[in-house]
A protein has these predicted regions:
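FIC/Doc superfamily catalytic core
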Residues: 1-236, 240-298
């Protein structure tokens, strides 16, 4: 994406214009003020987690205002005719979708992901929990693909099917897999977003299903995704389940699912936060369209 082509010193300079003081910018990034001059001397020393924080702030302050334009329309990115029943084409695509949704949330390397999927054995430097997350994600998305695309069956979006999807994703990871959370959940990377109270989750999810189950355009699916993540019905795995629902709803509508991964991760978080805090979805809709277009080129 556009922000990936800009070097980090330039991003820091532009962000400093926004924050005014280096101490304020350092606090927003999550580092000490001394880190900023150190980075100017050695930009390569910026750790990946802080590169992500810088990218997210850059997207938030510069790209989001640029993308927040009503009245934009996009041609639907349809599922190519060459995809169904062509394993040589759709399997690499599924692997990219699966790794992407894991990469957004964890630091798992592509090598470890491939080893977990291909060998179905635990890599030496990977916890059993992360191993299950990788394997469950890939095979759950593969099941969705085979059900909707190969068998021509619609994935009926309901509370029960969403819970079943969560059980598949989180089996071997959490004891409460497949059940709504009974605790307050916090979204660590999104500011100003409050999740639904535990006692209100069933009612809010019932409302989500009523309003969003039949979403069939990329704009509707993007808005439904932000709404689902704001509810945050499960104790963990909400992002992966939310993106799996995006995939299912896109395939139901014969649309190509958007590809979210490390390349557009910062814009994904910035656009999601903007949609949930301000109720404005134009940047998120554009991101969905650009990510689906990129998936087609992949």
């Amino acid at each position: 994406m556009k922000y990936n082509e800009i070097d980090y010193i330039e991003k820091l300079d532009r962000l400093l214009e926004v924050y005014g003081m280096s101490a304020s910018l350092a606090e927003a990034i999550g580092v000490s003020r001394r880190s900023l001059p150190n980075w100017r001397d050695k930009p390569e020393s910026i750790k990946p987690e802080y590169r992500f924080n810088i990218d997210t702030l850059y997207c938030k302050h510069f790209l989001i205002p640029e993308w927040d334009k009503p009245g934009q329309s996009y041609a639907p990115v349809l599922l190519p005719d060459s995809f169904p029943n062509n394993e040589a084409i759709f399997m690499p695509f599924l692997r990219r979708l699966s790794y992407g949704t894991i990469e957004i949330e964890t630091g798992m390397s592509q090598e470890d992901f491939d080893l977990a999927i291909d060998a179905e054995r635990l890599p030496k430097n990977m916890s059993r929990e992360v191993f299950h997350e990788a394997v469950n994600t890939f095979f759950s998305l593969q099941w969705l693909w085979r059900k909707i695309v190969e068998r021509g069956e619609v994935f009926e979006v309901s509370e029960e099917s969403i819970k079943a999807l969560h059980a598949d994703f989180m089996r071997g990871v959490r004891e409460d897999a497949g059940f709504y959370s009974a605790k307050v959940r916090v979204m660590g990377r999104l500011e100003g977003v409050h999740t639904t109270l535990p006692e209100d989750i069933p009612e809010e999810m019932n409302r989500w299903v009523y309003k969003c189950a039949t979403a069939s355009t990329l704009a509707e699916i993007a808005e439904a995704h932000a709404y689902f993540i704001a509810i945050h019905p499960f104790g963990d795995g909400n992002g992966r389940i939310g993106r799996a629902l995006v995939m299912a709803q896109c395939l139901n509508a014969r649309l190509l699912p958007p590809l979210f991964d490390g390349e557009n991760r910062a814009m994904y978080y910035a656009a999601m936060e903007y949609a949930m805090v301000h109720g404005r979805h134009f940047p998120l809709i554009r991101l969905f369209h650009e990510s689906a277009t990129r998936a087609k080129r992949a």
